[in-house]
Amino acid sequence: LTKEGRKLAVGLALVALLAGGCGASTEGAGGPHPDYAKALAGSPPPLSALHRQANRLLEGGAEAYESRIASLRGYPIVVNVWASWCGPCRFEFPTLQKLSAAYGKRVAFLGVDKQDSEAHARAFLGSDPVPYPSYSDPNQDIGRAIGATGGVPDTAFYDRAGKLVYLKMGPYAKPAELRADVRRYALGEEERSE
C-alpha cells in the first residue's frame, strides 16, 4: 500500500471501531426492543393480564390505578413514576425492562407517567418499551396518592397486601441499587455482596 492508502485504511478502521462502540452498551440508554414473551410465559393470570397491556398508556387516573393495585393483591408491586422529559427516567428504563422480565412472574410492575402530553408519553414508551402498562397522571392524582409529589423518577414498592412499604424519591444512581430495592422490598430478599 502507498502512504496515502495506509492512512486511508487506518482512518477507515478507526471510524469503524468508533461507530461499533457507539451502540455497544444499552445500560442507561434506549436499546433494542426486547422480546419479553418467552421470559414471561406462564405468568399467573393477574400478572399475565399486566403483560397483555405491555407498554400501553392507560387512562382512568387514581381510581383506575387504585383498582389495579387492589386486583394485584397477593403479589408485590413495583411502581415507577416517570416522565418523557426526565433524563434519569430514560437511564432507569433499561434496568426496569430487565428486572420486569426477570421477576415478572412473581412481581407486578406498573408505570405512572407524570405531567406529560399523551404524544410525548407514547413516543417515550416507543423508544423504551416495557412489559407492563403505565397510567397517565397529568394532574398528579396518582402521585399524590402514593406520596410521589416531587420530581421524577420515583419508585414505589407495595407488599402482597397492597400496602405501600417504601417510596424511593429521586433517581437511582446505579442499576444495581434499583435491582437491590426490587429484591429487598418486592421479594423480601437481601442483596448479597459480590
List where the protein language model places each region:
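N-terminal targeting signals for export/organelle localization
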Residues: 1-59, 191-194
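A short beta-strand-turn-helix
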Residues: 53-77
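Sec-exported extracytoplasmic/periplasmic mature domains
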Residues: 70-74, 91, 98-105, 126-133, ...
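Short pre-active-site segment immediately N-terminal to redox-active cysteine/selenocysteine motifs
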Residues: 75-77, 82-85, 151
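Hydrophobic beta-strand anchors of alpha/beta hydrolase catalytic cores
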Residues: 78-79, 109, 155
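Active-site-proximal beta-strand/loop segments in catalytic clefts of secreted hydrolases
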Residues: 81-83, 112-115, 137-138, 168-170
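Structural microenvironment flanking redox-active thiols in thiol-disulfide oxidoreductases
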Residues: 90-128, 138-145
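Thiol/disulfide oxidoreductase modules built on the thioredoxin-like
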Residues: 124-131, 138-193
